[in-house]
Amino acid sequence: MRILYKQPGQDPRSLVIPNELKVMQQLVGGRIETLRISDNGILVMNEEGKLLGLEENFYFGAIGDTIVGPVLVVGEDGEDFASLPDDEAAEISQIMRGGFEI
C-alpha cells in the first residue's frame, strides 16, 4: 500500500509497504497508535512516543499538540488500512511541513 512517511527533521515521503502490522511497528519504532486526521487519512505513530522522549516531528493544530517520533499516514478501506489517496497525501504532506493546519 502507498503511504506517507515522515521522520523528525525530514520532509515527508511516499513509500510503498506491505499492509502488515509488523512493518508499521518497525517504521514507528514500537506499538502503534492511530489518529484520524482527514476523511481518508489515518496517522500511525508510536503509542509511547512521548513517554519514550522521542524527537518532535511536527505540530498538529487540529489537536493542539506536537506529534513525536517517526509517523506514517495510511488510507482506509472500510475497517482496513489501505493506500493513501494522492490528493490526501499532498494535503497532509503540506501540513507536516508546517504549511497550514486542518
What is the meaning of each model-derived region?
Residues M1-I102:
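Domain-length accessory/inserted modules outside core catalytic folds
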